[in-house]
Amino acid sequence: MAVVTMKQLLEAGVHFGHRTQRWNPKMKEYIFGARKGIYIIDLQKTSKLLEEAYNFVRDKAAEGGTILFVGTKKQAQQVIKQEAERCGAFYVNHRWLGGLLTNFQTIRKRIDKLIELEEMEANGEFDNLPKKEQSRLRRILDKLRKNLGGLKEMDRIPDVIYIVDPRKERNAVYEANLLKIPTVSIVDTNCDPDEIDYIIPGNDDAIRAIQLITSKIADAYLEGKEGVSYQEEPQEQKEENSEEIFDIEDEEESEEI
């Protein structure tokens, strides 16, 4: 069984990279060619590397490991929240707080404050306070929910971090590498693949592409925890290859790099 089909990757636009003026030369081996000033990612390599990332996350989950989903760019926020909640992962989808990993004990105190305020709200304790104090506490609560709402159950640093756009989430990547926490990430043509342990070459700007890849990482985590396969039944023949990308888009020849 395949983790993802070539058709799914194509339909989600995973193969579209950035403009040729904006690229990282380290990504050259994952690029098939260029068309109309846009790099085209080699989906054969994407498929293979996604499978490696899937197996890694699945095996970590089977060992009882935890995973943190990170994606704060607008296109990723809702997907990160939905898929993390679906598979029972932790998540950050608005703002990465400095020291979230490297100074986790301090961050944990803020998470505890969030839980305390939520309990006060649920118990009606806010209603017994002066309106000015209610307003102040609700502002604090809203801010904590936004930044830490996906971390309430995280009592230690995670075993794996999944990231959408390592350039955007460079602070998360830095902290993870500092603590030697394995990273899995969608890596577009403008990113540095050397910073990531398990790269998934792909479009990190299109919502459909982010949704597809993130859902597969969530499936891997669920499969590891539950022991039930979430992989796709084969739907297409092996001979489908990267060249077919261009037949689908138009008949112009691509520019090899």
UniProtKB/Swiss-Prot annotation:
Keyword Metal-binding annotated: no
One cellular component (GO) term of this entry: cytosolic small ribosomal subunit
GO molecular function: structural constituent of ribosome
Gene (UniProt): rpsB
Region entry Disordered, spans: 227-257
Family: Belongs to the universal ribosomal protein uS2 family.
Name of the protein this chain belongs to: Small ribosomal subunit protein uS2
Any single GO BP term: translation
Origin: domain of life: Bacteria
NCBIfam families documented for this protein: rpsB_bact
Acidic residues bias spans: 241-257
Organism of provenance: Thermosipho melanesiensis (strain DSM 12029 / CIP 104789 / BI429)
Protein keywords: Ribonucleoprotein, Ribosomal protein
